[in-house]
């Protein structure tokens, strides 16, 4: 039986420059669940082709909040691209929520979107379509292959940093300048 390293839930997963997979190159993911069966996260720096207004309209939810309508919906990853995921900072009891850690939550139910449209939603929220998933041991293997860095989750990176700056900002929080790293790695 293998021993699971420290669970990575509530960590930011930061793609290293050598990671060439177009889905994950220069990406930042919030790891929402991690155990011996695998990991699940949501990419937090990839805009999709949709705005929140378009998604709400498709769901039959009206809002007069122009800022909310123009909010970009993120491409959260290649798994379940038809499902919505809301990362937020509101501890209210939504129909389907998971506390990721330190005041950050993941909700997958319609009620949070209805509350947001009515002006009664979380103060900070990211909406994504799809998520990223790793099978048992897969994320640990990729970390060992130097594909990713990890950093503690940071509300400023998630909610206050521009999408295009999140990759470099997340790494900078742990003292890493990604532009000074090479795009290849070795093993001793």
From Swiss-Prot:
Write the signal peptide boundaries.
Answer: none
- InterPro entries the record matches: AlgH-like
Where does the source fall among the domains of life?
Bacteria
Q: Which GO terms describe its cellular component?
A: cytosol
One matching Pfam family is DUF179
Q: What SUPFAM superfamilies is this protein classified in?
A: VC0467-like (SSF143456)
Give the protein family: Belongs to the UPF0301 (AlgH) family.
Name listed for the protein in its UniProt record: UPF0301 protein XCC2748
Organism of origin is Xanthomonas campestris pv. campestris (strain ATCC 33913 / DSM 3586 / NCPPB 528 / LMG 568 / P 25)
What are the leading ranks of the lineage?
Bacteria, Pseudomonadati, Pseudomonadota, Gammaproteobacteria, Lysobacterales
């Amino acid at each position: 039986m293998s021993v699971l390293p420290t669970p990575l839930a509530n960590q930011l997963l930061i793609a290293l420059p050598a990671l060439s997979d177009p889905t994950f190159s220069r990406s930042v993911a919030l790891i929402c669940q991690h155990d011996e069966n695998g990991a699940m996260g949501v990419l937090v720096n990839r805009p999709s082709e949709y705005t929140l207004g378009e998604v709400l309209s498709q769901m039959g939810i009206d809002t007069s909040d122009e800022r909310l309508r123009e909010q970009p919906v993120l491409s959260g990853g290649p798994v379940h691209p038809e499902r919505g995921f809301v990362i937020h900072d509101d501890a209210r009891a939504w129909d389907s929520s998971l506390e990721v850690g330190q005041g950050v939550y993941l909700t997958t139910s319609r009620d949070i979107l209805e509350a947001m449209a009515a002006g009664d939603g979380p103060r900070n929220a990211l909406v994504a379509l799809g998520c990223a998933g790793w099978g048992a041991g897969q994320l640990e293997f990729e970390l060992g292959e130097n594909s990713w860095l990890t950093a503690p989750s940071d509300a400023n990176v998630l909610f206050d940093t521009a999408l295009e700056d999140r990759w470099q900002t997340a790494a900078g929080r742990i003292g890493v300048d990604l532009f000074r790293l090479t795009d290849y790695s070795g093993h001793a």
